[in-house]
C-alpha cells in the first residue's frame, strides 16, 4: 500500500514539472515573437524567424540604434522627400557596417542582388565566416585603428580601400545555389573608419556615466563584373584592352584613337605602365598585385597619358581570364572608364607623347646602304643595331679582319684571341715574331700554346730574380691567384702535438728554381698518389719507374711497397720543375713557411721530432741514415742520379732519434 502511494506522488510531481516547463517555453516563445514584431521588418518576414535569428537581429538592431543616436545623421527637412530609396538605386553596390570585432551590424537590402544572400541571413553574423581565409588578415588590418604619424594632422587617417572575396550563391545565369555550393566573388570595398561618442547617461546614483566611443567601419561594397557579362556597346567614354600577365598590350580597342589619340598598333607590345602618370604608378602597381592574387581588381582614379600631351583621368576594372591550361594561356582583360577629358594638353610627360619617338629602327634608303661598309655602321640608328644583321660577305673577308664585324663588347671579350699575347724574350729562347692581330682559325691552337709558354717563362724569370729565402717575409697576396688557393684553416686545435716536437729543417732553394706558391690550407694527410700505370701524372718521367729501367739505368734493388709511391711522387715534382721551370698547377699541402715542403708521407713521420726551421742543415749529413729502411736508399739514389749537380736537398728529414748514428 505504501509502495503504491509513493509511486502516485512521484508521477504527480513529474507532471507538474512538465507543465511548468511547457508554460515557460510558451511564455518565452510569446516574448520572442513580440520582440520579433517590434523589429523594423515586415510582418511576413518576422513571423518565419527562429529564436536564434530573433536574438541575433535584436542585438544588431540595438547596435545600430546606438550608432544612429551617437552619430550626426542628416535629418529629412520639412517638406522634403526621403532619399533613402534613391541611394540604393544610385549605388552600384551595397552598404555594410562592421563593428570593431568584425560583426555585420547592418547591410542594405540590395545585398541579395550581388551575393544571393538575403539581408536577414547576414546581419549579426561575423564577416570572417563569409570571406576567403586569405583575406582575413587584410580585413583585420582595416578594422584596426591606425595611429597618427603626422604632427601637422591632428586626426588619424580613416579612409579604407581594399578587396575581399566573399561567398556568393548567385550563378552567371542568375540562379541561386545552396550556401554549401557557394563560390567566391571579388568585392571592391571603400569607406571610412568611424568613431561615434554615445550621449552621456546618468547612473542611478545621479553621477554622469561615460562610455567608450563606438568604433565601426562603414563600407560601400561593389562587385566587379566579369567582362563576359558586359553589354557590347560600352559607350564613347570607355574602351577595352587585353594584356599579358606582365601588362603588355596584346589588343586594344579602336576607340582609344578617338579618346587618347593612339593607334592600336602603336600600343601592341608596349607595357601599360609607360602610359600611366609617374605619380600614379605606385597605386596602379598595388592594384595589379591584387589582380594577380585575387583574379579581379579595380584601380583608383589615375592619369592616362594622351598622345599629343596631357592626360585623362581614368579608372580601370581588370579581370584575369584563362583560355586553357597553364599560366601561359592566361590574359588580363581591362575595361577603362574615362572620367574626364584631356587636361593640360600642352604638357609632355613621357617620350610616348613625342612625335619623334618610335620603337622601331628607322629604315634606310637604298642609296644610303650602298656606300656604307658593314651595312650602316655609321647610320643614325643606335650602333648596336648594326651588329644584329651583318651583311653577307665571304669567309676570306671575314678572316682578313674579323674585328670589323664584332660589337664593342665582343671585341673586348675576344681581345686575347684577336690581338694575341705580347711577345716575351728570354735568354734561352729567341724573340718571338709578332703575330698578326687577326690570325686564321687554323693557326690559333699552336700559336696560342707558344704564347702561353712564353708567358710562363717570362713570369718564371721575373720570380727567380726576386726569390725570398727568409721565412718571416710573407708572400705578396696580390701576386697570388686567390681563386685557386684554399683558405687558411688552422689545425692547431685539431692535432695536439707533443711539446718536444720540432719542425723539419729549412732547405734553401737554388736561385734558378722558381719559388712555389704557399698553400693556404693543411689537411694533415697528403692526398694519395695514383699508380703511374693507371693515371700518369703530368710532368712525370718514365725513368723513375724502378720496375722497368731504361736508357742505361742500372737496376735497383726491390723496393718496399710503400716506398715506390713516395719515390714516384718525389720524382714527378723534381722532374717537372727541371723541365718546365714553372710551378705545377697543384702541389702537396704544406705549413705556413714558404720554403718548407711537406713530403707525401704518412702521419707517423709528422708525429716524430724535427729540428727548428731556423737551423740550417749540415751539408755533410748523409742522405740516408743508418736507421732508415734499407729499401728506401736505392729509391732515393735513383732520384738524384739524373739531376744536375746542385746543392743536395733532404726531402725526407729523419726523426730526432733516427738522426744519431751509432
UniProtKB/Swiss-Prot annotation:
Please tell me which stretches of this chain the record labels as motif LRRLL: 414-418
Q: Where is this region: ODD?
A: 448-581
Q: Provide the phenotype resulting from gene inactivation.
A: Mice appeared outwardly normal and are viable and fertile. Show hypertrophy of the right atrium and ventricle, disarrangement of striated muscle fibers in the heart, and pulmonary hyperplasia.
Induction comment: Isoform 2 is up-regulated in corneal epithelium cells under hypoxia (at protein level). Isoform 2 is up-regulated by hypoxia in a HIF1A-dependent manner. Isoform 3 is up-regulated by hypoxia.
4-hydroxyproline sites (modified residues):
487
Motif LAPYISMD covers 485-492
Tissue and organ distribution: Isoform 3 is expressed in endothelial cells of vessels and capillaries in alveoli of the neonatal lung (at protein level). Expressed in lung, brain, heart and kidney. Isoform 2 is expressed in heart and lung. Isoform 2 is highly expressed in the epithelial cell layer of the cornea with lower expression in the layers of ganglion cells, inner nuclear cells, and rods and cones of the retina. Isoform 2 is expressed in the cerebellum only in the Purkinje cell layer.
**Residues covered by the PAS domain:** 80-150, 225-295
Molecular function terms in GO for this entry? DNA binding; DNA-binding transcription factor activity; DNA-binding transcription factor activity, RNA polymerase II-specific; protein dimerization activity; RNA polymerase II cis-regulatory region sequence-specific DNA binding
Per UniProt, residues of the bHLH domain are: 12-65
Q: What does this protein do?
A: Acts as a transcriptional regulator in adaptive response to low oxygen tension. Acts as a regulator of hypoxia-inducible gene expression. Plays a role in the development of the cardiorespiratory system.
In Swiss-Prot or TrEMBL terms, this protein is called Hypoxia-inducible factor 3-alpha
Species per Swiss-Prot/TrEMBL record: Mus musculus (Mouse)
Amino acid at each position: 500500500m505504501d509502495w503504491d502511494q509513493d509511486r502516485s506522488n512521484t508521477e504527480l510531481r513529474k507532471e507538474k514539472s512538465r507543465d511548468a516547463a511547457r508554460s515557460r517555453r510558451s511564455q518565452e516563445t510569446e516574448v520572442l515573437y513580440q520582440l520579433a514584431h517590434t523589429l523594423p521588418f515586415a510582418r511576413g518576414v518576422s513571423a518565419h524567424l527562429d529564436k536564434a535569428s530573433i536574438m541575433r537581429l535584436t542585438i544588431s538592431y540595438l547596435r545600430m540604434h546606438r550608432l544612429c543616436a551617437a552619430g550626426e545623421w542628416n535629418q529629412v527637412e520639412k517638406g522634403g522627400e526621403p532619399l533613402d530609396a534613391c541611394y540604393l538605386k544610385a549605388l552600384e553596390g551595397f552598404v555594410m557596417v562592421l563593428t570593431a570585432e568584425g560583426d555585420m551590424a547592418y547591410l542594405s537590402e540590395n545585398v541579395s542582388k550581388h551575393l544571393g544572400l538575403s539581408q536577414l541571413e547576414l546581419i549579426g553574423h561575423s564577416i570572417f565566416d563569409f570571406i576567403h581565409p586569405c583575406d582575413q588578415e587584410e580585413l583585420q588590418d582595416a578594422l584596426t585603428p591606425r595611429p597618427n604619424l603626422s604632427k601637422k594632422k591632428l586626426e588619424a587617417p580613416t579612409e579604407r580601400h581594399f578587396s575581399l572575396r566573399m561567398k556568393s550563391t548567385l550563378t552567371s545565369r542568375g540562379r541561386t545555389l545552396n550556401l554549401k555550393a557557394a563560390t567566391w566573388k571579388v568585392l571592391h570595398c571603400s569607406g571610412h573608419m568611424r568613431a561615434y561618442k554615445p550621449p552621456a547617461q546618468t547612473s542611478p546614483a545621479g553621477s554622469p556615466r561615460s562610455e567608450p566611443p563606438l568604433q565601426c567601419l562603414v563600407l560601400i561594397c561593389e562587385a566587379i563584373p566579369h567582362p563576359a557579362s558586359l553589354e557590347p556597346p560600352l559607350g564613347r567614354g570607355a574602351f577595352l584592352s587585353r594584356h599579358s600577365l606582365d601588362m603588355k598590350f596584346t589588343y586594344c580597342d579602336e576607340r582609344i584613337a578617338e579618346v587618347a589619340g593612339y593607334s592600336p598598333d602603336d600600343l601592341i607590345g608596349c607595357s601599360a605602365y609607360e602610359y600611366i602618370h609617374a605619380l600614379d604608378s605606385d597605386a596602379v602597381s598595388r592594384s595589379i598585385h591584387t589582380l594577380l592574387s585575387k583574379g579581379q581588381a579595380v584601380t583608383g582614379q589615375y592619369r592616362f597619358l594622351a598622345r599629343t600631351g596631357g592626360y585623362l583621368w581614368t579608372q580601370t576594372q581588370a579581370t584575369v581570364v584563362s583560355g586553357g591550361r597553364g599560366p601561359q594561356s592566361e590574359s588580363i582583360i581591362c575595361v577603362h572608364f574615362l572620367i574626364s577629358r584631356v587636361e593640360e594638353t600642352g604638357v609632355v610627360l613621357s617620350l610616348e607623347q613625342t612625335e619623334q619617338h618610335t620603337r622601331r629602327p628607322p629604315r634606310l634608303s637604298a642609296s644610303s646602304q650602298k656606300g656604307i661598309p658593314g651595312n650602316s655602321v655609321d647610320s643614325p640608328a643606335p650602333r648596336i643595331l648594326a651588329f644584329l644583321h651583318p651583311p653577307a660577305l665571304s669567309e676570306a673577308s671575314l678572316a682578313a679582319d674579323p674585328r670589323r664585324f664584332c660589337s664593342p663588347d665582343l671585341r673586348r671579350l675576344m681581345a686575347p684571341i684577336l690581338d694575341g699575347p705580347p711577345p716575351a724574350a728570354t735568354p734561352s729562347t729567341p724573340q718571338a715574331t709578332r703575330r698578326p692581330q687577326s690570325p686564321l682559325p687554323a693557326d690559333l691552337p699552336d700559336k696560342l700554346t707558344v704564347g702561353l709558354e712564353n708567358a710562363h717563362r717570362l713570369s718564371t724569370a721575373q720570380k727567380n730574380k726576386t726569390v725570398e729565402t727568409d721565412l718571416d717575409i710573407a708572400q705578396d697576396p696580390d701576386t697570388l691567384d686567390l681563386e685557386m688557393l684554399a683558405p687558411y684553416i688552422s689545425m692547431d686545435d685539431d692535432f695536439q702535438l707533443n711539446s718536444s716536437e720540432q719542425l723539419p729543417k729549412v732547405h734553401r732553394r737554388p736561385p734558378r728554381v722558381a719559388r712555389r706558391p704557399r698553400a693556404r690550407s693543411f689537411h694533415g694527410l697528403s692526398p694519395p698518389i695514383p699508380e703511374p700505370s693507371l693515371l700518369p701524372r703530368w710532368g712525370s718521367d718514365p725513368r723513375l719507374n724502378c720496375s722497368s729501367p731504361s736508357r742505361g739505368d742500372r737496376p735497383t734493388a726491390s723496393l718496399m711497397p710503400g716506398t715506390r709511391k713516395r719515390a714516384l711522387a718525389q720524382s714527378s715534382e723534381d722532374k717537372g720543375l727541371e723541365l718546365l721551370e714553372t710551378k705545377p698547377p697543384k702541389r702537396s699541402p704544406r705549413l705556413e713557411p714558404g720554403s718548407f715542403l711537406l713530403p707525401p708521407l704518412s702521419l707517423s713521420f709528422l708525429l716524430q721530432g724535427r729540428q727548428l726551421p731556423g737551423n740550417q742543415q749540415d751539408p755533410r749529413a748523409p742522405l740516408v741514415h743508418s736507421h732508415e729502411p734499407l729499401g728506401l736508399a736505392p729509391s732515393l739514389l735513383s732520384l738524384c742520379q739524373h739531376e744536375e749537380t746542385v746543392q743536395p736537398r733532404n726531402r725526407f728529414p729523419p726523426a730526432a732519434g733516427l738522426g744519431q748514428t751509432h
